[in-house]
Amino acid sequence: MLVGMSTPYIEWQPNFSVGIEKIDKQHQHLISLINQLAAAIANGHSRETLARVLDGLVDYARWHFLDEEKHIAEKLEPDLLHSHQAEHDQYLATVLSLQQDFETGAIDLDEQTLTFLFHWMGTHILGSDKHALL
């Protein structure tokens, strides 16, 4: 449960590193944004505040994916790059759907939302990103 959360929801771990400092810093910032969302949920912030934090996460993720794909394009065959881009596109589609459902009042942001964000990010960084960038 998030009530009274006093530690970050997600902490950067050395094994998250993909060996490219610029990308690692971007991943750290994404983790920071997820932690900001977790703190806002835990502290009972308004829907407006939650929407603003989620908007920031979506915007940054979109920018990060484009930047990361530039690095990957230099290393991977086109079909592997397209596969990686498809993972990014699927994530963004899911998060945009969550964002829209939240904005219309159809859902609340909760621990299940955070679990999805954390799980996807962790498995993507430790799997696809490491494979593509190392």
Sequence positions of predicted segments:
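Small-residue-biased structural context
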Residues: L2-L134
